[in-house]
Amino acid sequence: MAMLLPQNPSQVHAAAVNGDKNTLHKLITESALRDSEDQFGRTPLMYCVLADRLDCAEVLLKAGAGINKTDHSQRTALHLAAQKGNVRFMKLLLSRHADWRLKDLEEMTPLHLASRHSSSKPLSLLLKHMAPGEVDTQDRNKQTALHWSAFYNHPEHVKLLIKHDSNIGIPDSEGKIPLHWAAHNKHPNATRTVRCILEAAPTESLLNWQDYEGRTPLHFAVADGNEAVVEVLTSYEGCSVTAYDNLFRTPLHWAALLGHAKIVHLLLERNKSGMIPSDSQGATPLHYGAQSNFADTVAVFLKHHSVRDEPDLEGRTAFMWAAGKGSNDVIKIMLDLKKDIDINMTDKYGGTALHAAALSGHVSTVRLLLEQGGMVDPLDVMKHTPLFRACEMGHRDVILTLIKGGARVDLVDIDGHSALHWAALGGNAEVCEVLMENGISPNLQDQAGRTPLQCAAYAGYINCMALLIQHDADPNIQDKEGRTALHWSCNNGYLDAVKLLLGCGAFPNHMEHTEERYTPLDYALLGEHQELTQFLLEHGALSIAAIQDIAASSIQALYKGYKVRRAFRERKKLLMRHEQLRKDAAKKREEERRREAEQQLSFAEAGQKQRVLLAAVGVEKLSLDEAEQRVKDSVAAKGHKHKKSSSAHNSQSRREKPSRAERRTREPETSDAPSIRSLPPVTPMSTKKCPVTREEVCVRETFGPDTGISLNCGSANERRSPAGSSRPGSAKPVHTGTHVAPGHMETTPTPKPRPSTTGAHSKNASQDTPQHNETQTTSKGNKPISEHKPTGSQPSNNTSVTRQKEKRQEKETHREKDKRSRTEGDKQTVREKQKGTGIERAKERLMGRTRKKLAEKEKEKKKDGTCSKNQAAVVIQRAWRRSCVRGRIRKVLCRSLKGVESAEATALLIQLLWEWPVLHDHTHRKPSDVQAPPTRIAGKKSSVLQNIYGAAPSKRGTSLRAAALKTQSQSQSQVLLDLSLRTHKQLSAVECVNLVDSVSQAKQFSYHLRPSSGASQSSQN
């Protein structure tokens, strides 16, 4: 079959185009040549259609040429005939059963192509051969023949298609219906097509149909500026003038933006809402017209009663938009039509119309605003003036205009930037020169410490940097972080800028003030600028690592010198301290020697005094058994009276017993020792108004009741309290018994017949064992109760009296409480009678109970505080009196006694005086302590006094004497050696007495207060 093909198959196409029937008959004898295709895939039949060779087409069709053959565009001969509008060929092809449903590459049928043609005959011919429903066939863009007819503004085609039931509401791929394409035509006859479509369905949904961008047919009509179509569309009541597209723009916005003044007027008149819409930024159509400099359109807006110059969301008015766009005509129109326009009105950020004009660089607008009275230096929120905006953008003419208008060049913004900073940051060398000529310093720093040179170096503006350096800009100024202009140039790798700075004297090794302490070389290394790094190294630049190495070596050298100097100073201090210690040791040894000499001297004087006492006082020697029996009797009497005493006193008595047993074992028995029967009897004491001190008691016990020795009792009635006489009075202690403990009571001797036998003496002694009973009661006014005078027979009488007194006091208190409760009850009943409701009575009862409880609590607190204060005062008075009695006894024994007595009597007196506080200190208790168990107040009293004064002398007497024996054994032994051998044997069980130590111990509990007379006498001694 290939052998039958001619050498040049294009001859068939040429014969078809030229209409050479004879040649065509000859060539188409071969079947392969009937449908031969050229380079476009077209057959001879297609060329016949294109060349309008109907006879040749008939020849080809009779010869059997393919009628539905397609070219490379998938178009058939019918497509070409419909496109050409050749009705004859269309009839021929349709009569030969050509398929009109075939689509080309754009999915267009011959119907779509026929709708493009101005004649409606090809379209009507095709419609005759179509079945119902096939008229709305869509192409690739989802468009029907009606879309194409409306687009090409063929009203007859539209009517014909609508007559054949074409759907007018089918959207294409852009969401547009045929009405959109009909309105989107600038031809005045487009109104016919629009009317044809609207007459078919004049609905509101069709009028306001929005495509996929939200635009209605009115948007397209306004955009094309077709006033006739706009008038036709707006003539229908359902047409919306304020419909928003996806950009929130209405047809009125598009009319103002494009400057269609007539359409604007028409839309304003057809706007039934009476409100001017705004877009997504709050801009009104007036803003759009003002920025486009359409003075006529703006005039139409301003003349309409519903239009106002409202600001947008940023606070900018249409006047500001016009100034920013340089619309001088609009500015003039607005100033003429709106006399109330404020030229200096500010937006949300404080900007004015002059700011906008200066930023845009419109010199004429700036000049016009200044002529109309605009402020030359208004400040926005960033404290920028119009001059700052012009310098930032580099508008030299605007800057000169503003400076001539009086703009200040010395102002700075909120960050401390001057106009020169902004000009340098923009690289505007000419503007920088103008500003420096007007007095701005090139070394002015902002709040971060940056200069205009650093701003220019940051962007690498060489010309600006050179100009600043020519005007004496310092390249070595550092900002607050330590960076210089060289840092910024190296950071961005500007080699030319680095060369310029180093050539102008910039120091290459400035370090940052941050933790990294980077230098310009470090910035170049971090940015991997190799050429710049090499250049810096050649000019002596160092990195922070190299600088740290150099600094480390210098610091090490300095530290070595410092260590040597410090070692020398420490050695010097050590030698000086050694010398000082040696001097202190020598001084201490000298003081110890002097102290030892003084102690030996004092011990010698004490021994001499004791020898005088032993020689002066003559008392028969006591036997060891009788002395021990006497001590046991006193201890037994003490235990009988104080059964419920504290465990501390019992432990102390137990510690004293073994010591006495040891003395009994060590004491040698002598045959010629006098018995205790030969001693004078101990006379009992009775309390009087004039108290007798311990000195008088001791003297009368030694020399008898008839002795003529008398002591001064002038200050006996005085109240000896460490707190002074200003303290409120407390209960006076009352004591009974014969033996007197120092500072616990004041007694006077009562003469009694001296017994002749030892048994009587021991009996009296056992009966008259000192029982110190203290009765301390406080009345309402803290006045002391009258003293109780005991008979001195037995302790039970005292306790019974105190119990009776306590019972009386309790009865009195109960009576007082009953009286108070009765009076309060009477008052309460009166109040209840006055009150009307039961609720108020219940409230009053509750309040009364709470008041009673509070009053009782306050009374108990006051009573406890008063008792504790009185008890503390009594104990302090006892300690004070004890110290005074001991001092006076010592003075009496040293001064008044001059007789010579036996050493045994002296030893006995010393023993009695020494053991008296130990034996009878536990008996000084309140009667309540004997009759009832101790209360909380007593425990608090002892703990409080122990915290104030330490342990009682009676409790720690044994420990003090043991310490004294241990530390001063040599001195005491030296004193006792001076006694006779017989006396030494009898006194071996008696502890050594040091009256000076006793007085010093007493001083610890009396605040070192002594009577003036006693102090003067002691100083004289």
Swiss-Prot record:
A motif (D-box 1) lies at residues 483-491. It holds the Pfam family Ank. The keyword Glycoprotein does not apply. The D-box (destruction box) mediate the interaction with APC proteins, and may act as a recognition signal for degradation via the ubiquitin-proteasome pathway. Disulfide bonds: none annotated. One of its GO terms (cellular component) is cilium. Residues 548-577, 869-898 form the IQ domain. Gene3D superfamilies: Ankyrin repeat-containing domain. Residues 759-781, 791-802 have a biased composition (Polar residues). One of its GO terms (biological process) is cloaca development. Required for normal renal development and establishment of left-right axis. Probably acts as a molecular switch between different Wnt signaling pathways. Inhibits the canonical Wnt pathway by targeting cytoplasmic disheveled for degradation by the ubiquitin-proteasome. This suggests that it is required in renal development to oppose the repression of terminal differentiation of tubular epithelial cells by Wnt signaling. Its main location: cytoplasm. PANTHER family: ANKYRIN REPEAT AND PROTEIN KINASE DOMAIN-CONTAINING PROTEIN (PTHR24198), INVERSIN-A (PTHR24198:SF194). InterPro entries: Ankyrin_rpt (IPR002110), Ankyrin_rpt-contain_sf (IPR036770), IQ_motif_EF-hand-BS (IPR000048). GO terms for molecular function: calmodulin binding. Keywords: ANK repeat, Calmodulin-binding, Cytoplasm, Cytoskeleton, Developmental protein, Repeat, Wnt signaling pathway. ANK repeats lie at residues 7-36, 40-69, 73-102, 106-137, 141-170, 174-206, 213-243, 247-276, 281-310, 314-343, 349-378, 382-411, 415-444, 448-477, 481-510, 516-546. This is Inversin. Residues 579-602, 632-691, 704-868 are annotated as: Disordered. The keyword Hydrolase does not apply. Transmembrane segments: none annotated. It is found in: Cytoplasm; Cytoplasm, Cytoskeleton. A motif (D-box 2) lies at residues 862-870. It comes from Danio rerio (Zebrafish). The lineage of its organism: Eukaryota, Metazoa, Chordata, Craniata, Vertebrata. Residues 579-598, 653-669, 803-866 have a biased composition (Basic and acidic residues).
